[in-house]
Curated annotation (Swiss-Prot):
Catalysed reactions, semicolon-separated: D-glycero-beta-D-manno-heptose 7-phosphate + ATP = D-glycero-beta-D-manno-heptose 1,7-bisphosphate + ADP + H(+); D-glycero-beta-D-manno-heptose 1-phosphate + ATP + H(+) = ADP-D-glycero-beta-D-manno-heptose + diphosphate
Associated pathway: Nucleotide-sugar biosynthesis; ADP-L-glycero-beta-D-manno-heptose biosynthesis; ADP-L-glycero-beta-D-manno-heptose from D-glycero-beta-D-manno-heptose 7-phosphate: step 1/4; Nucleotide-sugar biosynthesis; ADP-L-glycero-beta-D-manno-heptose biosynthesis; ADP-L-glycero-beta-D-manno-heptose from D-glycero-beta-D-manno-heptose 7-phosphate: step 3/4
Designated name of the protein: Bifunctional protein HldE
Residues reported to bind ATP: N195, M196, L197, E198
An example Gene Ontology molecular-function term: ATP binding
Chain intervals for the UniProt region annotation (Ribokinase): 1-318
Gene behind this protein: hldE
Species per Swiss-Prot/TrEMBL record: Aliivibrio salmonicida (strain LFI1238) (Vibrio salmonicida (strain LFI1238))
Function: Catalyzes the ADP transfer from ATP to D-glycero-beta-D-manno-heptose 1-phosphate, yielding ADP-D-glycero-beta-D-manno-heptose.
EC code: 2.7.1.167, 2.7.7.70
Amino acid sequence: MKPTLPNYDQSGVLIVGDVMLDRYWVGPTSRISPEAPVPVVKVENNEERPGGAANVAMNVAALGGQAHLVGLVGEDEPAQALTTTLESLKVHCDFVALPNFPTITKLRVMSRGQQLIRLDFEESFHDIPAEPIISRMQATLPKVKAVVLSDYAKGALEHVQLMIQEARKAGVPVFIDPKGADFERYRGATLLTPNMLEFETVVGKVKDEEDLVVKGQQIIEEFDFEALLVTRSEHGMTLLRSDMAPLHLPTQAREVFDVTGAGDTVISVLAASVSTGKPLDEACALANAAAGVVVGKLGTSTLSTIELAEAIHGSQDSGFGIINEELLISAVKQARERGEKVVMTNGCFDILHAGHVYYLNHAAELGDRLIVAVNTNESVQRLKGPGRPINPTDRRMAVLAGLGAVDWVVPFSEDTPQRLISEVLPTLLVKGGDYEIKDIAGGAEVIAAGGEVKVLNFEDGCSTTGIIEAIKGGRG
């Protein structure tokens, strides 16, 4: 299966679970302490990263999605540091601050790429009333299309059954990264993502793939799940659903440096993809591709849609789909570094017809990559008047992204794409119709940067206006 990249700007995910702060002290070591037989590290750098459920939220936000995070913290400096870091990454935090508990913090001392010691500052949260977290969930559920419950057995999910029931009552799917052998506590969830060790802790030793499928189906039926996604390390992943054939996804990892946080990445990409409307099998394929990227990085890590797109398609393949402006600029820079010629065009593309397809195919033939900039709904309304667009922005972009000729689709809200074009600066800017080159928005900027501008002919007899009039007139 080769999935297409969704528009993660349209995704909204609520993450509830055990939030943590990972701290790293890094420096060289060249001697042994005279006080004890331990190395002395001269700390030169320190780094802070959100961990646990906070890492899941950070992954959703890194894709461009709306991430809402609920969890338990202390009234302390680590809580402030965690909140500041997450909010700078556009994660919406709604923490329950408890005066008698510390924020879970893990301090790692590193030297020469090796971890010398880890110091944990934590106390498992216990006997915490359900109301503070449930009320925060209830306030956020109308804003999201998926819920992730991230369980590290630290106490934030003490009332997990109430959380599942609230989400299902709101009609929102619930994805759970489980901890421990008690799957009963997750009864009624949409999907669990156990790794192979966690799965075998519940069902016993798995002999082969057939045995995996049989035991997985039993788990689904016993605990009223809709699906299981079993992550299997070098063997990839297996998606199991009731009364459906299993989907085995081979690993896409090229090199494995660190599996830390890979489970967080899997469930974040899975939930974010489903929240954009992707079917479950395609969302799992995207999560599998994402896992292949992050295990090649050191420590808990996020990935961008550019990295995910390249994992899906390969850097030389047909395209990366819907993308935002910031990531487009980065992608174009990488394309130039590969020596690729980048072509750009723009339009409303309200009702895609044969003329559009001929035009885009012609534009794509003029270079190695084709960008299509699309007017948003508000922009189309100003240009075309009442009743337009017929199709909203996300649907128009989805159709364009499905064309083999198109690499990237990006929205713009202004009346013209001049600002966007001047930021991207394609190698070649093309426009269809009978324009003079001097009148094409962004043309002067492209030429000034050493690029070209061309006008392409439209196919005769094809127009969106003509199609709309024909429909109104009842003609086929």
